[in-house]
Design a protein with these regions (language model features):
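Anion (oxyanion) recognition and catalysis
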Residues: 116-117, 199
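Asp-based, Mg2+/Mn2+-dependent phosphohydrolase catalytic module
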Residues: 6-20, 129-130, 136-225
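Generic hydrophobic alpha-helical segments
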Residues: 62-66, 112, 152
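N-terminal helical cap/lid subdomain that shapes the substrate entry/recognition surface
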Residues: 17-106, 117-118, 129-132, 220
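Short amphipathic alpha-helical segments and helix-helix/interface helices
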Residues: 39, 109-113, 124, 171, ...
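Proline-centered loop/turn at the N-terminus of a beta-strand
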Residues: 121-123, 204
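Generic structural signal for small/hydrophobic residues in well-ordered secondary structure
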Residues: 25-28, 69, 124, 155, ...
């Protein structure tokens, strides 16, 4: 081994942080999205004030309510009808909502399964709603002939947990229910507030850029033996 190789090896050993758990955000980290397409789709339905309720990271009003699971889809459709002043077929609302989503590249689906084979525990922690997540289960996670639970050990979804990021309580509940130690856990998220909240609890974090290929990151976080 040359001196340069030895120095690189020492530097890698110092920098590497073994972890047991990897937690992925969904939108912007695994699945790409098109916010403008979603806004335009709702405007075509007559929902002209949609941009008051929807953004890439946190929602407001009744869009926040369906994301934190405090209203049912049926109640949510009725709220939209009242907002626009006329009835809209729920299927058309679903289509407009899910137009926000694009796809997960195959290499990222392969990455998730490979991480599990290497010995990591792989989780999802996402602010999402039942309509969008059911669409993803059918149209994204099944495209390789598998199911979503072939890619993750466990799912932590805001609408099921009745709480959303970046609130501290959702991270604490994830750690407790997933039996995770913060210092053995890496969160990959594209929201600065989410990363800051997780870091404050001692979780290792990585702020991902939209549609980033971050596979090389795991050299720095090898699986804990």
């Amino acid at each position: 081994m040359s001196l340069n190789d030895y120095l690189w090896f020492l530097n890698f050993k110092v920098m590497s942080i073994p972890v047991r758990n990897i937690v992925f955000d969904l939108g912007g980290v695994l699945i790409d999205y098109d916010l403008q397409r979603c806004l335009d789709s709702f405007r075509k339905l007559g929902f002209t004030q949609i941009d008051r309720y929807v953004n890439p990271y946190t929602q407001s009003g009744f869009f926040a309510q369906i994301e934190n699971g405090t209203v049912t889809p049926a109640q949510w459709y009725a709220m939209i009808d009242r907002e626009v002043g006329h009835h809209i077929d729920p299927q058309r609302i679903d289509e407009a909502l899910c137009s926000f989503l694009i796809d997960i590249p195959d290499y990222k689906l392969d990455m998730l399964r490979d991480l599990r084979r290497q010995g990591y525990r792989v989780f999802m922690l996402s602010n999402t709603n039942v309509i969008m997540f059911e669409w993803m289960k059918q149209h994204v996670f099944k495209k390789q002939g598998l199911t979503v639970l072939d890619y993750f050990d466990r799912l932590f979804l805001s609408y099921e947990m009745k709480m959303v990021k970046p609130n501290e309580e959702i991270f604490r509940k994830m750690l407790a229910d997933g039996e995770m130690v913060p210092t053995e856990t890496l969160l990959i998220d594209d929201g600065e507030a989410n990363v800051a909240a997780a870091s404050a609890l001692g979780i290792h974090t990585y702020l991902a850029h939209r549609a980033e290929d971050f596979r090389s990151l795991f050299h720095q976080y090898p699986p804990m033996k």
